Each structure stands twice: as C-alpha cells, then as structure tokens.
Amino acid sequence: MAYQVLARKWRPKTFADLVGQEHVVKALRNALDEGRLHHAYLLTGTRGVGKTTIARILAKSLNCENAVHGEPCGQCESCTQIDSGRYVDLLEIDAASNTGIDNIREVLENAQYAPTAGKYKVYIIDEVHMLSKSAFNAMLKTLEEPPEHVKFILATTDPHKVPITVLSRCLQFVLRNMTTQQVAEHLAHVLDRENVPYQPQALQLLGRASAGSMRDALSLLDQAIAM
C-alpha cells in the first residue's frame, strides 16, 4: 500500500474529530440542528487551520441521511461518497486554477438544476479571492437569489480581496490559528495511533515551528519521522 501523508490520513471527517475552532463548530452544529441554514458560508483563516476540512464536514452534515445534532454519521451513502470524492451533488473548485468567468458560469448554470442524490447541491470554492472581477459579478446574482437547493461554502486566506458585495451575502467565520499545545497534543495522538515513539519536547518544538497550522505541523512530523 502506498504511503499516505499524515495530513491526508488524519484529516478530520466529523466535527467531533476537529482540533480547535470550537466557536465555528458550535455555531454550525446549532444552525444544522435547528434548521437555520444560510445559503452561503465564508471560512477565512491562514493556511492549514481547517477551512477545507470544515467545508467538507459541513457538506456531509447538509446531506447526511442520519445526522444527529448536526454531526454527520459517516456511514450513510452520502457521507461515504463525500469522503471518497465521488458525491455527485458536491463540487469542489480551486479558484486559483479556475479564475475566469467561464469556469464560474458553468457552475452557476449547473446550480439551477435540482440535486441528483442529496437534499442540497454544495459548492466548495477554495481560495475564492483568486476569482476574477467578472467571475465575482457572475456569482453575485446567484448569491442574491439563490435556489433553495444550493449551498455555497467559500474559503479564503485573504478575505480583504473578496468584494464587499460578496462578503455581505455570506455568513462569515474566522478560523483561529492552533495553539502550540493543541498542535503538540494532536501530534501525540497521531503518533500513538501510528505506533511511533516520540519525546514530548520534540512535539512542542514542532508545534511552535508550525506557526498555528495543523497541516504544516503534520508535514513537519512526516519529515521528522523520515529522518
């Protein structure tokens, strides 16, 4: 079996698995539990703090067949297909590679049609600030008058580059950097599960070196294990 980097292998699949971001998790769980769903969410924060991970978990919760208190079950067909990247009603777009209006127009035209399998069509647009001005303008009309069956989850490291007209139509969550202690404790958990010995002081060093990014911390841990 090919080696899978730790950041991918140990990516959280439920809200309960997440490290940190309790303020975001609590708000999303409450909204899901009470059915107070916004049509567009914007997740902001530095790299590696959980924006895309939370977006995927939220996508699962929105379409999970057995969600309890906003937590996806992880077992139903919707959850397993989202985890494997095969869910027809979830589209992930990297705006850094798809900046133009043609890319977004195709998405928006598709959004008008009802979901194939789930309750909602979910569009995750990563690094949304990279979209062109014309692409933002095209997206704005859909954000103003969204179909009932569509949810947008936008993620960015640079919200200041997102037009205010788009920001004002999204429910915004600011993700915080991880503390050194949060990182060190999670690295210890991963190493225990991987049956790799470690020194606690070394994990503290990795936690500080990661500058609050869990993904960077796990990448550094991969390098340390290889040495």
Please identify what each model-predicted range represents.
Residues C64, K119, H149-V150, T179, ...:
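Non-transmembrane, interaction-prone segments in cytosolic or luminal domains
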Residues Y123, A188-D192, A202-A209, R215-M227:
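C-terminal helical "lid" of AAA+/P-loop NTPase domains
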Residues L108, A184, A188-L191:
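A conserved short alpha-helical segment within the catalytic HATPase_c
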Residues M1-Q172, Q182:
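P-loop/Walker A NTP-binding region and its immediately flanking N-terminal helices
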Residues A7-R8, H186, Q199:
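Short hydrophobic/aromatic segments of transmembrane alpha-helices and their interfaces
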Residues D94, Q172-A184, N195-P197, R208:
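Conserved AAA+ ATPase "SRH/arginine-finger" region at the nucleotide-binding site
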Residues N66, E194-N195:
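Short, polar/flexible loop-turn hinges at active-site or ligand-entry regions and domain interfaces
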Residues N98, N177, A211-M214:
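Short, solvent-exposed loop/helix junctions and linker helices
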